[in-house]
Amino acid sequence: MITANEIRHRFLEFFRKNGHEVVDSSSLVPNDDPTLLFTNAGMVQFKKIFLGQEKRAYSRATTSQKCLRVGGKHNDLENVGRTARHHTFFEMLGNFSFGDYFKEDAIRFAWSFITEELKLPKEKLYITIYRDDDEAEKLWQSVAGVPSERIYRLGEKDNFWSMGDTGPCGPCSEIHIDQGADMACGPDCGIGKCDCDRFLEIWNLVFMQYDQAPDGTRTPLPNPCIDTGMGLERIAAVCQNVRSNFDCDLFQAFINYTAELAGVSYRKDSEDTDTALRVIADHSRAIAFMIADGILPSNEGRGYVLRRLIRRAYRFGRLIGLEGSYLYKTALKVVEEMGGAFPELLENKDFMARVVREEEERFNKTLDKGLLLLEDELSALTARNSTCVAGDVAFKLYDTFGFPLDIVNDIAEKRGFSVDEDGFKKLMQEQKSRAKAAWKGGGEQTLAARFQALLEEGIASEFVGYDHLSAESRIIALLGEDMESVEALPAGAAGYLVSTRTPFYGESGGQLGDTGDAVSETGSAEVTDTLKPSAKLLVHVVKVSQGELLRDQAVTLTVREGQRFASARNHTCTHILHAALRKVLGDHVKQAGSLVGPERLRFDFTHISAMTPEEILAVENEVNRVILSDIALNSEHMAYDDAVQKGAMALFGEKYESEVRVVSIPGESVELCGGTHLRATGQAGSFYITSESGVAAGVRRIEAVTGWDAVRLFMQQRAELHEVAGLVKGKPGDIAGRVKTLQKEVRTLKKDMEKLAAQAASGKGRNLMDSVEEVNGVKLLAASLPGANVKALREVMDDVRSKLTSGVACLVAVDGDKVHMLIAVSKDLHDRFTAPALIKDVAARIGGSGGGRPDMAQAGGTDPQGVEDAFACLRQIMGA
């Protein structure tokens, strides 16, 4: 039997031998494509090439692309585990031509691979083509030898592909395999008539040959392209002669492992058990790959999809008897089985397991409470002969207990109920609207639109700041505060200035924009910030201090040297810190965000738990070691692929052009970075971590200072240390020991004070019996014990109860603005009074509440002035 791993290997090798570049799978997070939540097809990483916006060194490529389809038009989540073909995560095998070969070679390659490499029987293969694609039909007949009776013409819905309403598009051909009459859905089963599994589509060949205009007209592309896709899971099932993708070797290892954990059997127990095992197998793959690609559980965007998958898989595990944390084990099984083909799984193995386990434990705390609420709702609906779970109930389950809507749907549907999804969505939208109303925006969308308009007008600027802090330039655009173009900015006016070239670094990559001055023949302005809306546009935020600035005039731009150097120092230390964290904590550490300014640096990174003091010190020492080694930095421009092969770290979520700048500290760090840096690490001087904290699940944050800022902070803390040493009458080097000694002395004194207080209270207690009164035939002792703590109060009450064999006792101790109260009732009076019943009304008089057993109750209050009123209330209750 041919394995899925072998199919993947054969596919890539086949196309490599036919002149294709084997390109690694891109991340599940699309690079610089806001239209996509996840990479969902092989062509996504080549989209800019197809659009003519990017060129690469090769014109033929082949990949095995990681894909995820959850949400949007590809929302198959409810079908996953219940059908033979639906998945969240899958691999797409594909070959691509960028203006190189076209239909004839694409058809030849595909037919050769499936009939010669995979040895699928030709007589069982059928082809669908676009209804007007006469060329494709002739080629399938002449190149592949497919007879006309096995070629079907279908419409645009089935056999025409487009990237969107406009842009590259073209007809496609699909290869189908006949799996046998026993797979038919009925007597009318056939290609183009149904979607059953008898005639199963296994490969789609897209011939991008047109450019579609907004009005729908199509013109031929000058360089037609090829984009093909074949699902690995599907072709593996076909080659292994199994009827379901879940029965191929890609899934069986996970299904069998989970079945063993749960003590159940696949295909032998119930269909519900089989569904649960398939869901867990599918979701475990998606979860492992998502975390390996830097996605972490959260309540929005990609992170929420991950959280949904973890929680959905976890609930299905509970349905087959799994308890505690178990999903992290199935995710580790994914690493074991697929880490060879995808090394990122191995690199993030431990981190991934910890993230999943923490999320499991978090959900487990609320799962039972949420299920109880839903069960109560379903019971109430049954009693009312209703079958729809209200939207507000579904929303409460989501908002309070963390139940994704699909989990509520799963449970409700299984019991014969539906869910008011419209009501749920309305409440979700109201919540989002409230959040938006609470946020005061800054007009970022207006800025972005205006800057995009400048780019479309051909306005661009060149950055020369790596080598110069001052440059002569020409003003090519001026905008007022309202973002409208102006010919001049007068004194006192604020606005935006764009020049042909500039030494000012625009905010990007976490580094803040430069500040400085702009001086022309007619005026001068302070540059308060520099923006970088795109790689080709740098915008100075200015405030004119004297005269006026005019469009199309010469201008001298000068960066503030001190601030630039301070920012460069912090940026270089950010790179050193990143490397140090990976060395101390492990290779799972990845940058999750940063802020680099002249005064400090902030670095967010993936790590599941708080750093220990020892780890923080180790990181600090490592950074300072690199600084004191005074290593010269290197920076060079090269192709992105070459940089990655060189070991440069591409930071998660960052956009990179085809040519990138690589900043390296030899022997320590290599990163893709466009920021400004020191010439050598020694210029940083020193490094000091000021805080380490958590900012999200699995994300930690370090804040630090460098150079003189670090020295000043050290000197300040040293002065404070000397001051503390003086206060505790010790030396700076002995402070820890001296403080421990003082703490021990304080504990001893506290115990002595408690003992004295207890003795005093006990003495007071012995005298209290003289204060016993009688109310309505019942003995009552109501007394206050000044200076007694709770422990002493209890000891006195025990003494009083031993002496007052029948009666009620109420003792009160006041500690500042806090009031402690105890009420005891002897057993023979329980038919008339109980301690909890008495204390409920009495404690209200001291601004508190309490409870307890029939014989003893306690309360706390905040109104010492109400003590006598409380005693009077007790007498009144007993006398009634």
From Swiss-Prot:
Keyword entries, A-Z: Aminoacyl-tRNA synthetase, ATP-binding, Cytoplasm, Ligase, Metal-binding, Nucleotide-binding, Protein biosynthesis, RNA-binding, tRNA-binding, Zinc
Superkingdom, natural source: Bacteria
InterPro entries membership: aa-tRNA-synth_II/BPL/LPL, Ala-tRNA-lgiase_IIc, Ala-tRNA-ligase_IIc_anticod-bd, Ala-tRNA-synth_IIc_core, Ala-tRNA-synth_IIc_N, Ala-tRNA_ligase, Ala_tRNA_ligase_euk/bac, DHHA1_dom
Catalysed reactions, semicolon-separated: tRNA(Ala) + L-alanine + ATP = L-alanyl-tRNA(Ala) + AMP + diphosphate
Cofactor: how and how many bound: Binds 1 zinc ion per subunit.
EC number: 6.1.1.7
An annotated GO BP: negative regulation of DNA-templated transcription
Cofactor: Zn(2+)
GO molecular function: alanine-tRNA ligase activity; aminoacyl-tRNA deacylase activity; ATP binding; tRNA binding; zinc ion binding
Cell compartment(s), UniProt: Cytoplasm
GO cellular component: a single term: cytosol
Residues that bind Zn(2+): H571, H575, C673, H677
Similarity-based family: Belongs to the class-II aminoacyl-tRNA synthetase family.
Record text about domains: Consists of three domains; the N-terminal catalytic domain, the editing domain and the C-terminal C-Ala domain. The editing domain removes incorrectly charged amino acids, while the C-Ala domain, along with tRNA(Ala), serves as a bridge to cooperatively bring together the editing and aminoacylation centers thus stimulating deacylation of misacylated tRNAs.
PANTHER family in alphabetical order: ALANINE--TRNA LIGASE, CYTOPLASMIC (PTHR11777:SF9), ALANYL-TRNA SYNTHETASE (PTHR11777)
Chain's role: Catalyzes the attachment of alanine to tRNA(Ala) in a two-step reaction: alanine is first activated by ATP to form Ala-AMP and then transferred to the acceptor end of tRNA(Ala). Also edits incorrectly charged Ser-tRNA(Ala) and Gly-tRNA(Ala) via its editing domain.
Protein name stated in the entry: Alanine--tRNA ligase
